[in-house]
Amino acid sequence: MTIAITGATGHLGGEIIEELLRLGTSSNSIVPVIRNKAKAATFARRGMSPRIASYEDHGALRNAFDGAREMVLISSPVLNNAIRVQQLHNAVTAAHSVGVKHLIYIGLAAPEKQAFGLEEVELATEYLIRALGVPFTFIRNGVYFDELRSELEIAAKTGVLPSATGNQPLNWALRRDMACAVAAVLHQKGHEWKTYELTAAQAFTYDDLATALSQTTGRRVTHHQTDPASAVRALTDSGMPSEHASTIVEDFQTPIAHRKFTDHNDALTDFTGRPTDPATSIRTLFR
């Protein structure tokens, strides 16, 4: 069994590879697909067979995927939808043309809620895979709990967790757990033609985060609910770079306030056997 994995130098791709190796997958059956040739040696030293291709180069993608029975396609990080849709079209049609037997496509959870404005491309890619008849598993990842790290670090120091979330629920879970779920899909049988939404088993609020952080650190942390401009100012006043603070509030906290991340289910915990509550996730994130 040969497995091609795109985005292998990224956080998710790398964690999928590590979990596959932990599960006993032979390193010589893993084909990391990477853009930067300079990073190939890192994989080759571990017995893997890296191949060089970018999402823009259909021919290189064909060569990279050739001989792979299974493939993990991690959605493009590019935010321009016109570019993303072409990149993903290239990857899917390349996989189809070389006879990939099982395509695991990793996109965004709850695409119908349009949390980021990227979801139409995710859905178009799923429809393309269906139209070509490639056996698939669609993994729709929720937002990574890891995105909260900088906010939680500041709150642990200051005792205040500022947000413009309206204390609405969110369903974020650890990237590590999502990588484990993808590896399980590859390692087990019976996941073809299925769609999995990977989120926390129960949604939680910033109040819950503050409580969990208090329990974890031993320092009382309170959630301070405020407006977006004040949330950005509070984060920057605590030492966060202003651009990063604006991204957190505009791209993440505002969608939370608009209830874009409320759906939840047990699929992730069924794959990993691990809890997804805030306290557990915080301990894992900072250990």
Identify the residue ranges that each predicted region occupies.
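Terminal hydrophobic/aromatic helix or amphipathic segment near a protein terminus
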Residues: 212-258
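NAD(P)H-binding glycine-rich loop region in Rossmannoid oxidoreductase-like domains
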Residues: 32-97
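Glycine-/Pro-rich loop/turn segments that contact NAD(P) or position catalytic residues
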Residues: 74-158
